[in-house]
Amino acid sequence: MFKKILIANRGEIALRIIRACKEMGIRTVAVHSEEDRESLHVKTADESVCIGPAQSSESYLNIPNIISAAEITGADAIHPGYGFLAENSYFAEVCESCNIKFIGPSKEAILKMGDKVQARAIMRKAGVQIIPGSEGVISTVEEALKLVKKIKYPVIVKAAGGGGGKGMRIVQNEDALKNAILTAQNEAKRAFGNPEVYIEKYVEEPRHIEFQIMADSKGDVVYLPERDCSIQRRYQKLLEESPSTFISDKLRKKMGKAACRAARAVKYVTVGTVEFLVDKDGDYYFMEMNTRIQVEHPVSELVTGIDLVKEQIRLAAGERLDVDQDDIQVQGHAIECRVNAEDSEKDFIPSPGKITKFIVPGGPGVRVDSHIYTGYTIPPYYDSMIAKVLPYGHDREEAIIRMQRALSEFIVEGVKTTIPFHRRILENPYFKKGEVYTNFIQKRIIEEPNSKQ
């Protein structure tokens, strides 16, 4: 087992990893930008090292400085968390060359799943259903037109090396196709340095269902109950829950086994997430694999009792899985609301600033993961998430009631937050019935109230 882990991240995930390490008897090193000197992860770790100025490119994305910090402090492993360098295959390679263990999959697995075109080809070969579309990169408009004649409109143009909604365009007709390809290529080039795009059939009103997997170095893979991440705004998740109201036991097993096949196809080790789109008929299609710990991993922890961060560390250290598939069962229901420092009344613009009061909810069945405290100043340079509120209930109804109570107790003063917006979601009758799709926010929260006026 590792003796000292450097956490190459900040905020709540850095704090989450430090807590897991403490329980495992592993010493920790926090890295931080000049802006983050007073952050909670810096105060909580055994050691801390400043790695650069506030801008991420000069600190949390600065590979030489992070490696130097690990070597100076004698860390034998680096945990990348999520975001920043978590899915950077070059960083994983550099760690390996410096004899520092990267807590994640191999650089090869990251590369294969990071290239969406290559990932589709691998999944096709592994027998995992993919959305009908191009077999490779689309180079010309003529090539695109030929393909679309087969799969029909609507289609979606996607960046080959992208994610998070960038480099994506939905196309309803031939007139819009050429412009969509050029726009997506330019956006992908700016965001990812790679202008390549591919085309898929656009699945209308799908659910976004993902499966957490755990895999060891001997090739054993297990899946956890699904997470429903359909509540999104501009492809960014706002609320996740487990289990899904739509997924039957039979479908869960089929999709879970498909997720395991996906992991085995790239010889995946540690924890990861396989994401699917599921249509109204229950047909499911591979979308992508996230080769890291997810923001929403606590949802799965609550319904299984498995500490995913500890398991990630154990598996990276070469230990075997200590659970069989039959040991993993759905227990109750959990929901996560991502609370951001944003003004939902002004198109969700970030709201950085000093927190003058911060009181988190508590009571039975309520977990809050946060790095915020009264007096802390939220910097404008990073992600705006300030807390994850996670109620657990014996069933979905109890989990929703507990979330409503928790959000009503949550006091944040000094900045705007998305708490009022989350409360609107929870009060929506369609959400309560479990009728959620990826266009839920636009259709049921934004457009529907306006249509009644």
Residue ranges and their predicted role:
Residues 147-156:
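Acidic/histidine-enriched active-site and ligand-binding environments that engage anionic O-linkages
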Residues 7-16, 20-23, 48, 71-73, ...:
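ATP-dependent carboxylate activation and anion-phosphoryl transfer catalytic cores
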